[in-house]
Amino acid sequence: SRLCKYVFELTGNSADNVIDEGTRAVVMSLALEELTEKLRLLSSKGNKSLVDVMLQTVSDLKKSSVTSDELRSASMLVCDETLKTKLNETALISDTFDALVSQSYIDPMDDLTRLNDILLKNNVLRNYTIIFDGFSGFTMQQLKVVRSLIRDCSATYFTLTLDPLTDGSEEVFATSQQTYKILKEYAKRDGVDIK
């Protein structure tokens, strides 16, 4: 996103060697190959589509801000041995993939996480006004950045499509209504006035 690029340049954290989709697939294939002996259920032997499935899974985990440690913790709460194994193997694949990527590349799927880490350490946007337009909802990864911006910027504005005559439970407005509730809660927790 433009905000990521701006903050990265402002703070000297620009990414030079960004991984592309083709290279992501190669690195995932290498990660699965490296783990062949350790994987019981998610083995890549004879399963060419596993690379695509695991790339999508890693992407979904990052967007949802679910860490491999959280997957491992969840596996301890599960009685089903197959699910427990899948959670642990997914965590192992994710860790191995990230380790291989980090040796040579910057993963753009981590940009929002990197941005939020910068915002938490250094309030570089404290005198800025940020306007969000055209969003009805946010991923968890995006929400972490949004919360930092609500807390740190001099003003943050959001345009959401809501029907003032309903409670927002209608399907058409449900996502925007849920987003509004989340944003309102963030502002309340961080002592930010809502106008």
Where are these regions (language model features)?
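Conserved P-loop NTPase-based nucleic-acid remodeling module centered on helicase motor cores
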Residues: 1-73, 81
